[in-house]
């Protein structure tokens, strides 16, 4: 699957788009996302793994403040633009990378 096809496939899911909406603002733990979006942590983790495979997000292990096992936090990994032009005698889909920030 091409990068464009991967991006379109991943973004067709509404929950994944909602997850990305939160992660572009700031990194989150899966449980935070589950609480914010009103779905199970298991569902969030499943979608985060898909987004990670597509290089949309990355995970980092942070030490626990209470001395427990490290906690996993997710953040957006890349800046990109998808553009779809559609009309009579017109169909164009374009993906391009954007500078970070």
What are these regions (language model features)?
Residues 53-68:
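Beta-hairpin "wing" of winged helix-turn-helix
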Residues 42:
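Key DNA-contact positions within bacterial/archaeal DNA-binding proteins
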Residues 47:
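Residues within the DNA-recognition helix of helix-turn-helix
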Residues 9-16:
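Short helix-coil-helix linker/hinge
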Residues 1-8:
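Short, Lys/Arg-enriched N-terminal segment that forms or immediately precedes the first helix
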């Amino acid at each position: 699957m091409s990068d464009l096809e991967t991006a379109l496939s991943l973004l067709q899911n509404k929950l994944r788009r909602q997850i990305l909406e939160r992660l572009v603002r700031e990194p989150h733990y899966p449980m935070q996302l589950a609480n914010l979006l009103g779905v199970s942590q298991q569902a969030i983790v499943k979608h985060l793994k898909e987004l990670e495979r597509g290089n949309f997000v990355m995970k980092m292990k942070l030490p626990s403040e209470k001395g427990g096992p490290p906690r996993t936090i997710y953040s957006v990994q890349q800046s990109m633009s998808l553009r779809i032009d559609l009309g009579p005698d017109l169909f164009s889909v374009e993906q391009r990378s954007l500078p970070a920030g």
